[in-house]
Amino acid sequence: MPSPLVLALALLGSLVPVSPAPGQALQRVGIVGGREAPGSKWPWQVSLRLKGQYWRHICGGSLIHPQWVLTAAHCVGPNVVCPEEIRVQLREQHLYYQDHLLPVNRIVMHPNYYTPENGADIALLELEDPVNVSAHVQPVTLPPALQTFPTGTPCWVTGWGDVHSGTPLPPPFPLKQVKVPIVENSMCDVQYHLGLSTGDGVRIVREDMLCAGNSKSDSCQGDSGGPLVCRVRGVWLQAGVVSWGEGCAQPNRPGIYTRVAYYLDWIHQYVPKEP
């Protein structure tokens, strides 16, 4: 059996941050300006794997219940991937090194999803069996329905994606983290109109979206579907799901996330409020 290092080098040669959905240039798949996450942090982080020559990392996700994972719809759609073609890897410090892949029972994509730019970029994966919760594996807390995340809220995004636009995460593929500043939706919308011929009356950043990041810290291609979590009164709440953006850590182009609080009613049509 090849050593983990040999396997990692072989994977790197074929590792391209590809999502099964179109429009990849706008999808987020990496962490810019971050550092390796401590092994004891982010116990809800998961890696989504797509069947191929090997189970390839395509997106991030978050454990929100012992049997449910939250991710972006563009990771599994718009034509829903068969559950048999997807596996979930729970919190892993280095991709591919200690895989224990979990089968998926069903995939639920939001019915209003078409493209990330049009919103509703959210999906749920039901695992075949509930996982054992421990200090290393824990669901993240969803925010209350009226929870807002104003500028200045301490928020972090995590993932295994690109470290710069077009620069894949190198071996040993560590989980990365970066603190990102929240950008108010109105300001984010103004920034995204800069340099575009789109009229000011056309809303780019919609009410079901949330913006975070700047030219020094951002999510990138590979991080798609992963969690944006914010510390509120001592509790980590999942504010967003990594969705889309223009480039990575570009001026006036914050990362755009699906606003989790906006979709709580939809989430709880499937996911019990209590484990």
Curated annotation (Swiss-Prot):
- Which reaction is this enzyme known to catalyze? Preferential cleavage: Arg-|-Xaa, Lys-|-Xaa, but with more restricted specificity than trypsin
- Leader sequence range is 1-20
Residues annotated as catalytic: 74 (charge relay system), 121 (charge relay system), 224 (charge relay system)
Provide the protein's localization: Secreted
- Taking the record's annotation, the residue ranges forming a coiled coil are none
Q: Keywords assigned by UniProt?
A: Disulfide bond, Glycoprotein, Hydrolase, Protease, Secreted, Serine protease, Signal, Zymogen
Identify one Pfam family in the record.
Trypsin
**GO biological process per UniProt:** proteolysis
What GO cellular component is one of the record's annotations?
A: extracellular region
Cystine residue pairs = 59-75, 155-230, 188-211, 220-248
Asked if the Swiss-Prot or TrEMBL record annotates the protein with the keyword Disulfide bond, the reply is yes
Report residues carrying sugar chains.
Answer: 132
GO MF term list: serine-type endopeptidase activity
Q: Which InterPro entries match?
A: Peptidase_S1_PA, Peptidase_S1_PA_chymotrypsin, Peptidase_S1A, Trypsin_dom, TRYPSIN_HIS, TRYPSIN_SER
Which residue intervals define the domain Peptidase S1 in the entry? 31-272
Enzyme Commission number(s) from the entry = 3.4.21.59
Q: Report residue numbers covered by any propeptide.
A: 21-30
- Output the SMART domains linked to this UniProt entry: Tryp_SPc
**Per the record's keyword annotation, is Hydrolase included, yes or no?**
yes
Q: How does it assemble?
A: Homotetramer.
Q: Which family does it belong to?
A: Belongs to the peptidase S1 family. Tryptase subfamily.
Q: What does this protein do?
A: Tryptase is the major neutral protease present in mast cells and is secreted upon the coupled activation-degranulation response of this cell type.
Write down what this protein is called: Tryptase
What is the species listed in this Swiss-Prot or TrEMBL entry? Canis lupus familiaris (Dog)
